[in-house]
Amino acid sequence: MKFVNIYEIQRFDGQPTRHGIAPKKIFRSKYIPTGLVPRLKYWRDVPSRAEMSKRIGKYFEDEFKFYPNEEKLNEAVNIVQEKWISHYGTSLNVTSVSESFRTLPKSTSAGLPFKSGCTKYEARNKMMRFARSQWDRVSKELQLQVLPCRLGARCQLRKRGENKPRLIWAYPGYLSIIENQYLTAIKKVPPPNFIGWSTNWLDGGKSLNRLLFGDKWTWQSIAQIDFSSFDATVRTELIFHAFKILRSLFDLTRTENIMLDQLRHYFINTPILFYDKIIVKNRGIPSGSAFTQIIGTIVNMIACQYASLRSRDYNLRIPFSCWLGDDSFLNFETALCRQEFEYDYLEKFKELGLNVSIDKTHYTTRFIDDFEVRFKGVRPYVKFLGKQIDILLDLTFHNDLDKLDAQMALPEKEDLSAYETGVRLIGLVWAYGAHYDIYLRILKVYLSLKLKPEFHVQQLLSYSEKPERTKRYQENFFSSMKYQLNLDLDIYDLLAFPKFWDVSNRYFGSKYERLDFRSHKIYG
């Protein structure tokens, strides 16, 4: 693989390349009255150089010795591979460059050598032309030309006093297109139940019903594993196994095989422009790759299956479990105490070099003590894909009202008008408003904006006046509504603040179709 020195490259606009991140303070939205959202207990991360150095340093910490059982590891890989092949087959074909670009998120960074802030949509022609030129190089047995990733950060909400900005590897856009040519072929096939792509919390309770009752309540225990620094600690051996499984799904030509080898090499040995120097990692998963989620999912499946094979009593049921990245919802045939679960199952992850956060890992059995539930208020639950699944058959979403206040008042990007604030609040009510107290809290803030519905529609749909702002409205609106929440409502329905029962029915089903969760036996 040919590495291109960043200092020898001029940006397409002829200006020098910027290094690092310029940290800026996140201010409260000026359109939300302070009286409605009082003193906030949360703030957003600040991507200072010191904190970003800590994040990147996790990819280079000394590795402790780990000795997996090779026989069990290979068996786990074969089991996971069999599950993927049984659903996708072995004859997928790589898609074209243009089709790949159509399925990429258009508002994300185009990476180097484009200027900071340039989106993939703005750089689409040059990106696709460069991607095609790389296919020509590989077909002539030349090395893939690569650029380092651009440094980025995600400023998430934290309790005051904490600061842990999330490191983003902003991939060069042309490499994202080439990677996505493989991924698009996979996403054309409806996902199996064991991949989180099949889970949609706004499907009338079907996903919840499948997770809890898809096996007619025959599970004995369920768990959710929380990893510490999962992306930074994944070892190269596991990534090789994941790419092996990914490759087995395709019928590849010689050129496509070579290209996948070089993409894997870049995925493992990823360079990043880190302020005034270029750093190259040799382990871990980079966050900006098109392969990030699917490789992380396969690695997670392999690790969980390996721990199951190495434990004495935990038989993992893959068809009724679910994974997405480092998130997991595990279904077991055995019910033992929490201490036994930690000793017999969680300890096995250390053999693969993965760190499990014991305190944040949730485990519960179907044998729930009736006395503790009724008189002590014990509510066993697991968390999956940002939601809290109560085993007593109640789906909860956002109990931390202080954090909800911060989400309303502290936008990650500055609100350009009250109408953009309204769009964010509509997104929040669809994401968290299935409980009435939370719904009313968001509605109260929304009404304080005093928006005119017809002007709201005009601002979002019109390109005629202030096109740079209307474009921003559209990008924020459609990315949150269409991509993240998977809503299939008409756009004019989405622009109005929804009624409570419309939101509730999306999560739990209508009163005629609502799942009768209480009819299931929940006590052992």
UniProtKB/Swiss-Prot annotation:
Q: Which residues form a coiled coil?
A: none
Provide the catalytic activity annotation: RNA(n) + a ribonucleoside 5'-triphosphate = RNA(n+1) + diphosphate
* UniProt entry tagged with the keyword Transferase: yes
Supply the alphabetized keyword list.
Nucleotide-binding, Nucleotidyltransferase, RNA-directed RNA polymerase, Transferase, Viral RNA replication
An MF annotation (GO) of this entry: RNA binding
Q: Biological process GO annotation list?
A: DNA-templated transcription; viral RNA genome replication
Question: Which InterPro entries does the UniProt record give?
Answer: DNA/RNA_pol_sf, Rev_trsase/Diguanyl_cyclase, RNA-dir_pol_C, RNA-dir_pol_PSvirus
- Could you tell me what this protein does? RNA-dependent RNA polymerase which replicates the viral genome.
Protein name per Swiss-Prot or TrEMBL: RNA-directed RNA polymerase
